[in-house]
């Protein structure tokens, strides 16, 4: 009697691309080299100044697991491009969904390791630390795996989206928000933060793995990625000072409170709606619940006290 081989898990990888010719080959090869998975790679190419889309059309002849969405529209940001993918992707017949950038290198066991973690721990999302690397040979582990806090999902992502693996259930919940005309989801600038927040708002669990799963390329077009170097830190400080971060938190709070009304989140939303001494003092009480990193909690407290946040 013949023994049937167990089916490999089916993973749909969503890749957003823009002017990606320089590094996209390496990224796709690292996805093709994933072990013990059956992969479909769905790519949305934003209107580009190079020939990324036409190059990928030719590459499909070699990598038959590649599928391309229609080309020609301008989405203007990685988040909008990912939102298009989430809305248009056919999620049927897939066991897991992953996000991919166009310029990184995945560790060969990235997907299967995270699949096993999801199955062992009963979570709907897994992300991980990443190993940032530069053209000059510099490398640095970006640590995002500090213990999760009660409300960290209102203030930050679970790490870089390129490390995310999710269930179809979660992707459908994100899609519901993106297609709901009353939701602010499409206004969120970071798709990974939105995804993590929606998962946690539904009361579902997420795991952040300490083992890096992605070599996270740093170059002039994504200097913000690892938040490494004074230029990136200065840009983030300016965003904080000009109110960008607070506005994103306000939108995330609104979305999450709409998913599952919560008295504490509602009170936080009311505090964020005003800027006075009383609201500052009250906001400080949320700091210990807000960010995973001790340094980030200290910086958030300082920014609240100084009126920058």
Identify the function of each model-found stretch.
Residues 38-47, 69-71:
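Short beta-strand/loop segment that forms part of the nucleotide-sugar
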Residues 45-55, 75:
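A conserved acidic beta->alpha catalytic loop
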Residues 197-215:
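Catalytic donor-sugar/metal-binding loop of nucleotide-sugar-dependent glycosyltransferases
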Residues 94-103:
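Short beta-strand-to-loop acidic/aromatic patch adjacent to the donor-nucleotide binding site
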Residues 109-140:
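Conserved donor NDP-sugar-binding/catalytic core segment of glycosyltransferases
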Residues 20-33:
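Short, well-formed alpha-helical segments that are part of the catalytic scaffolds
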Residues 184-197:
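Acidic donor-binding loop at a coil-to-helix junction in glycosyltransferase catalytic cores
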Residues 72-91:
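Glycine-rich, basic loop-to-helix element that forms the pyrophosphate-binding segment
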């Amino acid at each position: 009697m013949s023994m049937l081989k167990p089916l490999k898990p089916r993973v749909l990888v969503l890749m957003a691309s823009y002017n990606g010719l320089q590094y996209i080959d390496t990224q796709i090869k690292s996805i093709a080299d994933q072990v013990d998975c059956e992969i479909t790679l769905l790519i949305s190419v934003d209107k580009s100044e190079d020939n990324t889309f036409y190059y990928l059309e030719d590459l499909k002849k070699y990598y038959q697991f590649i599928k391309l969405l229609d080309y020609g529209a301008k989405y203007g940001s990685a988040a909008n491009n990912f939102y298009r993918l989430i809305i248009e992707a056919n999620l049927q017949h897939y066991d897991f969904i992953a996000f991919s950038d166009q310029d990184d290198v995945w560790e060969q066991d990235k997907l299967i390791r995270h699949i096993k973690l999801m199955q062992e721990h009963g979570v709907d999302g897994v992300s991980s630390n990443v190993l940032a690397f530069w053209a000059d040979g510099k490398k640095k582990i970006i640590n995002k795996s500090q213990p999760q806090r009660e409300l960290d999902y209102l203030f930050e992502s679970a790490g870089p989206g390129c490390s995310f693996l999710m269930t179809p259930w979660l992707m459908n919940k994100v899609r519901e928000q993106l297609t709901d005309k009353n939701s602010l989801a499409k206004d969120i600038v970071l798709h990974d933060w939105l995804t993590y927040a929606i998962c946690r708002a539904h009361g579902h669990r997420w795991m952040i793995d300490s083992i890096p799963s992605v070599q996270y390329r740093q170059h002039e077009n994504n200097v913000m990625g690892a938040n490494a170097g004074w230029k990136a830190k200065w840009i983030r400080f300016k965003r904080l000072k000009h109110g960008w971060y607070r506005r994103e938190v306000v939108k995330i709070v609104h979305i999450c409170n709409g998913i599952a009304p919560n008295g504490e989140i509602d009170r936080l939303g009311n505090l964020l709606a005003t800027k006075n001494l009383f609201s500052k003092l009250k906001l400080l009480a949320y700091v210990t619940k807000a960010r995973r990193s001790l340094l980030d909690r200290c910086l958030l407290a300082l920014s609240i006290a100084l009126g920058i946040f």
